[in-house]
A protein has these predicted regions:
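Active-site catalytic motif of lipid deacylating hydrolases and related acyltransferases
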Residues: 2-57
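Active-site nucleophile loop of the alpha/beta-hydrolase fold
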Residues: 13-14, 34-39, 81-93, 117
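Catalytic histidine-centered segment of alpha/beta-hydrolase-like enzymes
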Residues: 43-44, 144-156
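Conserved alpha/beta-hydrolase fold motif
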Residues: 61-62, 83
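Gly/Ala-rich beta-loop-alpha elbow adjacent to hydrolase catalytic centers
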Residues: 63-72
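Short beta-strand/loop motif that positions the catalytic acidic residue
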Residues: 107-109, 113-120
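Conserved alpha/beta-hydrolase "acid-adjacent" motif
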Residues: 120-127, 149
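Catalytic histidine neighborhood in serine/cysteine hydrolases
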Residues: 133-149
């Protein structure tokens, strides 16, 4: 597997951090992940935080897992940055100020790919497939779990995005 040269911003999930196995599995020279305390920050604060980070880092690609997948979709659409989402939380219910991902967030021409391990014990990935399949490429694998059994699978999707959409 070759090394990835694109600048990647990884958005971790709820109760996770930059110590995430998903972040460390990404084989990229320029990868960034900033810890966010989602539980204690309201939606607008997190949105402004990610907008500021994107302006500073200027990533070529967003990669998000779980709640980070939710934010990757939001930021991808707002900033027109390609994204890869892994077992995304499309309707976060841990706070009342989060609105579910809907057609407005998905119906655009920005390259996005979903990597789904269907054995997720926290989120129903079959419902995620139904919601996303009309809008983006999906790579779904049987088994796995919410934290991802094979986070290294993200690398070939990142390579594909880099070769196809990132000059």
């Amino acid at each position: 597997m070759k090394n990835i040269h694109s600048k990647i911003l990884f958005l971790h999930g709820l109760d996770s951090s930059k110590e995430s196995t998903k972040f460390h599995a990404i084989n990229a020279e320029k990868k960034y992940c900033i810890d966010v305390d989602y539980r204690n920050l309201n939606y607008k604060t997190v949105e402004c935080f990610y907008q500021d980070i994107i302006e500073k880092i200027k990533p070529d690609l967003l990669v998000g897992h779980s709640l980070g997948g939710y934010w990757a979709l939001k930021m991808s659409q707002q900033h027109r940055i390609p994204a890869i989402i892994a077992n995304p939380s499309l309707d976060p219910d841990f706070r009342e100020d989060y609105v579910a991902i809907d057609e407005h967030d998905l119906d655009h021409d920005i390259p996005q790919i979903a990597y789904l391990e269907l054995g997720d014990e926290v989120l129903d990935m079959y419902k995620v497939v139904e919601q996303l399949e009309s809008y983006m490429q999906i790579e779904a694998v049987e088994g796995g779990h919410h934290r991802l059994v094979q986070p290294e699978n993200l690398n070939h999707l990142i390579e594909y995005m880099e070769q196809t959409f990132i000059a």
